């Protein structure tokens, strides 16, 4: 299923939960909406590239598996 940007934004806000939810939402939105690289996101959020990839993959799984 394809989502509009506004629908996807709302789904991310509603479905990405947890201890670091705000950070994870920001990372997922920057990656999906702005196309920011994993490397740049890692620098921006002071995380490893692997951590950023895991956040994005898990977030995409939550959003797109429904």
Please identify what each model-predicted range represents.
Residues 17-24:
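Short helix-coil-helix linker/hinge
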Residues 50:
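Key DNA-contact positions within bacterial/archaeal DNA-binding proteins
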